[in-house]
């Protein structure tokens, strides 16, 4: 570089000397307007001459550096242009603010759409809003119109209320034959049991329902007999009490008391007489009933004492 600078300086000095010589020659030739310099040559100012000589003497490396410096800002200006074009192609994106529904938790609005994860999330959320109006419409419809299940429930209640009296009537009609069937089944079950228990006394097994009904009728006929006999006895004894005389009469003022007291000795006397008053028949019937009941009791006791299981081998008495 120092040698290049030394070379530049003598050239500059020569130019200055030539220029001064030319300028000094001009006043001498003031008469003529033309310059004595040849046609191909023309005068150049000193500072311009220096610039031209310096440019000519510069090496190729300096020229390349200056060209690179000039091209650098041009490239810097051209580089942002593709980015700006891409932005123009994409267009200005509006700022989207997405808010969650009222019933959900609060969420901050989303302002950036650069990340792919956010885009996918926003797409998933974009599908949700159409479903919300349907869910909101359903409670309105349910409030305006009752559900079909409620209607069916009401209809079932009406059917039950209408069918209840009919069912009660049918049940009352069916209950009577059911009770009779139950009684018959019980009798059928118990009959073989009695036969098995009373195997030692076959007489009890032969006794049927007719015998029991006959005994019940006999007891029903015997029950009113004492009343009728008592009335007839009073009617028969009243004249007898009047014939006895005042000697048997008691000091009691009421006349009805005397016959009642007089009945006792008369009844005793009548009991002694054979075939007297009907009181004898009543006592005979009672004695027969007592005997029959005693016989039945004895039979039942014998059945209870007998073994319930029939013997495997014959037992000799």
From Swiss-Prot:
Spans through the membrane: none
Top-rank lineage group of the source organism: Eukaryota
Biased composition (Polar residues): 19-34
Disulphide connectivity of cysteines: none
Region of interest (Disordered), residue spans: 1-164
Annotated InterPro entries: DUF4691
Coiled-coil ranges (or none): none
Biased composition range(s): Basic and acidic residues: 1-11, 47-58, 71-92
Biased composition (Basic residues): 100-110, 151-161
PANTHER family for this protein: CHROMOSOME 16 OPEN READING FRAME 86
Name recorded for this polypeptide: Uncharacterized protein C16orf86
Species per Swiss-Prot/TrEMBL record: Homo sapiens (Human)
């Amino acid at each position: 570089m120092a040698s290049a600078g030394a070379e530049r300086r003598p050239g500059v000095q020569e130019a200055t000397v030539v220029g001064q010589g030319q300028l000094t020659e001009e006043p001498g030739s003031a008469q003529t307007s033309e310059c004595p310099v040849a046609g191909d040559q023309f005068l150049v100012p000193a500072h311009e001459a220096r610039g031209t000589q310096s440019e000519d003497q510069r090496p190729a490396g300096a020229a390349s550096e200056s060209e690179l410096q000039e091209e650098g800002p041009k490239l810097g200006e051209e580089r942002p242009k593709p980015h700006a074009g891409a932005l123009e192609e994409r267009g200005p994106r509006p700022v989207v603010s997405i808010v969650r529904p009222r019933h959900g938790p609060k969420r901050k609005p989303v302002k950036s759409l650069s990340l792919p994860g956010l885009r996918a999330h926003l797409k998933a959320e974009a599908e949700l809003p159409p479903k919300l109006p349907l869910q909101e419409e359903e409670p309105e419809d349910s409030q305006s119109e009752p559900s079909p299940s409620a209607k069916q429930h009401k209809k079932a209640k009406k059917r039950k209320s209408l069918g209840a009296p009919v069912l009660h009537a049918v049940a009352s009609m069916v209950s009577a034959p059911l009770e009779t069937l139950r009684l018959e089944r019980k009798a059928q079950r118990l009959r073989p049991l009695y036969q098995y228990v009373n195997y030692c006394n076959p007489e009890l097994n032969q006794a049927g329902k007719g015998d029991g009904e006959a005994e019940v009728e006999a007891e029903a006929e015997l029950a009113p007999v004492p009343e009728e006999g008592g009335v007839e006895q009073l009617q028969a004894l009243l004249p007898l009490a009047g014939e006895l005389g005042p000697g048997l009469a008691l000091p009691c003022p009421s006349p009805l008391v005397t016959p009642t007291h007089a009945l006792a000795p008369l009844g005793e006397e009548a009991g002694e007489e054979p075939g007297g008053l009907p009181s004898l028949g009543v006592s005979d019937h009672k004695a027969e009933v007592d005997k029959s009941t005693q016989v039945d009791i004895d039979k039942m006791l014998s059945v209870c004492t007998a073994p319930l299981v029939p013997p495997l081998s014959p037992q000799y008495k």
